[in-house]
Regions:
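Hydrophobic alpha-helical scaffolding
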Residues: 27-31, 54, 64-67, 71, ...
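Active/ligand-binding-proximal structured segments within catalytic/core domains
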Residues: 28-41, 72-127
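Secondary-structure transition/capping motifs at alpha-helix termini
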Residues: 42-44, 69-72, 105-113, 133-136, ...
Length: 186
């Protein structure tokens, strides 16, 4: 995936990393437990390897190692995301949702997500539960998740209001990320 973007701001830090802010970006910044994209930002004058993507307020910061050339402000650039890594992250993102639902199905609706880490190689899901999960329940949870994966259901994206999503059965996991008063609405 390659998109041309205008280079906004470039910052060089003491750690030899280059911090790039673009006017727009296809890179996903770390958020909600999901790690940020990596890839390449380049043009005919330079190449920079994006080693991490972070949010800082309203800005997306591309943390890069300069491979070659020099970067100047207001250059047009091409952005290339590591699409294989992103695909693996998407798979583990979906698996987090499957695991969360399986935990609710086996242990009860009191289970809520307290945090997560979505990485290309693994995932971690932190949940609230008053006791240790026994081996029998772990086996049942595994079976539910594996059966759902085996169904090979296509993933569909539908952008809608929080209210409409809740009417269709969506679960708001981190209420305050949706709206400031979303917790009162659940």
């Amino acid at each position: 995936w390659t998109l041309s973007r205008g280079l906004g701001d470039v910052y060089k830090r003491q750690d030899d990393k280059v911090y790039i802010v673009l006017d727009n970006t296809p890179f996903y910044a770390e958020s909600g437990g999901q790690i940020g994209d990596i890839g390449v930002i380049e043009n005919k004058d330079f190449s920079a390897k994006v080693v991490d993507t972070q949010k800082n307020g309203d800005f997306i910061i591309h943390i890069c190692s300069l491979v070659s050339g020099n970067i100047l402000e207001n250059m047009n650039v091409s952005c290339k995301i590591d699409s294989i890594r992103r695909k693996d992250i998407k798979i583990n993102h979906s698996a987090t949702h499957l695991l969360h639902q399986a935990l609710k199905d086996v242990l009860g609706n009191h289970i809520n997500q307290a945090g997560s880490l979505v990485h290309p190689d693994y995932l971690r899901l932190d949940v609230t539960h008053p006791s240790k999960i026994d081996t029998k329940d772990i086996t049942a949870i595994e079976l539910l998740v594996n059966n759902k994966i085996a169904e090979n259901i296509s993933v569909e994206t539908d952008i809608q209001s929080l209210e409409d999503a809740k009417k269709e059965g969506a679960t708001a996991l981190f209420c305050l990320l949706y709206t400031s008063d979303a917790a009162d609405e659940l």
